[in-house]
Amino acid sequence: MQNSLLNTHVTTIDGEVTTLEKYAGKVLLIVNVASRCGLTPQYEQLENIQKAWADQGFVVLGFPCNQFMGQEPGSEEEIKTYCASTWGVTFPMFSKIDVNGDARHPLYQKLIAAAPTAVAPEKSGFYERMVSKGRTPLYPDDILWNFEKFLVGRDGQVVQRFSPDMTPEDPIVMET
């Protein structure tokens, strides 16, 4: 059970079926991403922390998702090209997945089971704004929006879940 997250089958953005076992012993920040979202500039911060902490075994893993207002409509090739050319993304990207609902990817089933609620910036109001726009999660533990983050420790266990508006460079994320 200890490394069940790492044993989960995933598909890279280039179509290779693999597991996350090659990241064993590393700290992971797993993020559902989208290219046409107001939070898309977080790609830059994700890349910054990836570069800053890579030599200490830190890796960002991006999982595109089109479940939130269709904000990731492109093909894997389009996503890969956009992320590299617009944001300089070099961290590992994976094939588009569902993070909520009946087709929720097994990785996200495990992540959510380990961390059913997200830490949010104090008084951010992000959740309330989403609710006011009719974007209430179907279930309390659902991913709220693009760029929700899961920090996974070197032992393969989820350490914390962060809300979409908790930026990757937020001191709370960095101190965790």
Can you describe what each PLM-predicted range is?
Residues Y23, A34-L46, F63-P73, K149, ...:
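Short, thiol/selenol-centered motifs that function as redox-active sites or metal-ligating centers
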Residues N32, A54-E76, V89-G101:
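Thiol-based oxidoreductase modules, predominantly thioredoxin-like and allied folds used
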Residues P168-T176:
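A short, polar/charged loop-to-alpha-helix boundary motif
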Residues K26-L28, S35-R36, T40-P64, C83-W87:
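Conserved helix-turn-beta segment immediately C-terminal to the redox Cys motif
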Residues M1-E21, L39-P41, A118:
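N-terminal "domain-start" segment that seeds a small globular fold
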Residues Y82-T167:
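Thiol/selenol-based redox catalytic cores and closely related redox-interacting motifs
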